């Protein structure tokens, strides 16, 4: 029983480490996208945002992806593009 608990704790620690890495990657991408958007002229920025949103709409996944997941992705993309980090 102790071995099982120890193994579960090790797996939990590994998952937590993977989660931290993913959070760091997402934050890094947010910083890069924000910096790129700030360097663009307003008209170019709006054109890029519209293009990305249109492509995202065209690539909307089929029934194999839960609607909630698809909507969450769209919300995060819209938030990143329309309300970038400070």
From Swiss-Prot:
Keyword Iron: no
Coiled coil: 1-42
InterPro entries in the cross-refs: SigmaS_Anti-adapt_IraP (IPR019732)
Alphabetized UniProt keyword annotations: Coiled coil, Cytoplasm, Stress response
GO biological process: cellular response to starvation
GO CC entries: cytoplasm
Location(s), subcellular: Cytoplasm
Source species, domain of life: Bacteria
Main location (coarse class): cytoplasm
Subunit structure: Interacts with RssB.
Role, per record: Inhibits RpoS proteolysis by regulating RssB activity, thereby increasing the stability of the sigma stress factor RpoS especially during phosphate starvation, but also in stationary phase and during nitrogen starvation. Its effect on RpoS stability is due to its interaction with RssB, which probably blocks the interaction of RssB with RpoS, and the consequent delivery of the RssB-RpoS complex to the ClpXP protein degradation pathway.
Similarity section: Belongs to the IraP family.
Name this protein carries in UniProt: Anti-adapter protein IraP
Organism this protein belongs to: Enterobacter sp. (strain 638)
Top-level taxonomy: Bacteria, Pseudomonadati, Pseudomonadota, Gammaproteobacteria, Enterobacterales
Name of encoding gene: iraP
